[in-house]
Amino acid sequence: MSPLECSECFGDQLMHRTYTWHLTLHSRPNFTRKREIRSESLEIPINVILPQRGTEPFLRLHNLYTTPRCSRQAAMPRISRRVASQHSYPLNRFSSMPFDPMERPTSQADLELDYNPPRVQLSDEMFVFQDGRWVNESCRLQSPYFSPSSSFHHKLHHKRMAKEYLLQEENKSLRDENRALRDENKALRKENKILQVFWEEHKVTLGHEESQTSSPLLHKDTTSQEVVKKDNATLPAQRSKENTLQFIREENRALQQLLEQRQAYWAQAEESATSAEEGKPTSSPKEEPHNSGLLPDQSTSHSSHFEEPKASPTTQEDSKTLRALREMVTNLSGPSGEEEGKAGPNLTDSAQPLQLLREMNQALQALREENRLLQEENRALHAMREEHRVFQEENKALWENNKLKLQQRLVIDTVTEVTARMEMLIEELYAFMPAKNNKDPKKPSRV
């Protein structure tokens, strides 16, 4: 039922003054046989409604029927004839002058009509035309003369709830992202600390190794295998890798120098041997055992001519250099004094430095591969740090944007509230101002 059919159902939306008179009708007393006097009385309430907005007053008699006229009246308890009904129609209207000439004319809200104000959407804000001005729909104040329908309130409530839900979801996602960034930052800090510790240890080991490089190369060649074994057994994985890499490099250098020296000695020995063969083509059998310390590249006839006691001074010098070379090889490969007369052990002793060199080269290649992998991991770590820094900047920008949005909302709310209060105060001032020639005064411009 519309508000015109049952106007008192929407009494909370009407802004008027109501005066009620109760008329009581008494009937004549009836005398019964039992000498009892009975009199009947009927109360009729009369309401005179005086609206506040310059409308005509009208008289309203309450309904005397007990049948409900609307859904709200049907839900109320049934009353007797003596109790006044609270629903009626306007029975009579009479014209008269408005009680307050300064009041404005009747609006649609005063007539209890369904009124949907015009709306305009600018960017993501909705504005409503209310009381002669455009007001933001999310933060506007309800006017006492404006009573929108229930569907309008329902839609507005749902819009506000949807906006709040979106803001909550956005804040939740930002919190989750911030938490993930914090965890990633903690992990990166831990990795940075570990890398710093490794770098300090690497510096210490490099300084220790540089101090050890002052010792002679031959002494290092003889003790390199034992030092490598001890380091692999005692030091941790990282230290052992770095130490073995450095030791292998030093051993490779020493072995290269040793091979160059041996090649030079072998070239000199071959030249002297060719010159001796031209002088004496035959060799004595007593000088064969002295050939045990030479490498397989040298023949037995060459060694016999170098070790003759009655040879020329050049051959004696060559024999001295070969003996020194033999001692260096024996120190590098180990003592072999008992096996000097056999050819098989001499071959194994001469092949040991080459085998050691091959193993060292293999270890060096493996360590180079590990170093390359570590460098790739370091590059990936730097890339992750850069991404983390970019994420932190984006998170900071989002946080500042949300902060500015909240500040803008607060400013808009305060401005609308202040303007609404100023308008209410202006209207109250107009109400207290005296009338001049029964004309409405002009309103000053809004601040």
Swiss-Prot record:
Start-end of Basic and acidic residues biased regions: 218-232, 277-290
Specify the domain of life of the species encoding this protein. Eukaryota
Q: Which InterPro entries match?
A: Chibby_fam
* Renumbered residue ranges of the record's region Disordered: 208-244, 266-320
Gene Ontology CC annotation, any one: cytoplasmic vesicle
Q: Where is the composition biased (Low complexity)?
A: 266-276
Q: What is an example of a Pfam family matching this protein?
A: Chibby
**Residues where Phosphoserine occurs?**
S41, S85, S88, S96, S123, S143, S147, S149, S211, S224, S272, S275, S333, S336
| Complex formation | Homodimer. Binds to NEK1.
Q: What is this protein called?
A: Protein chibby homolog 2
Primary gene name: Cby2
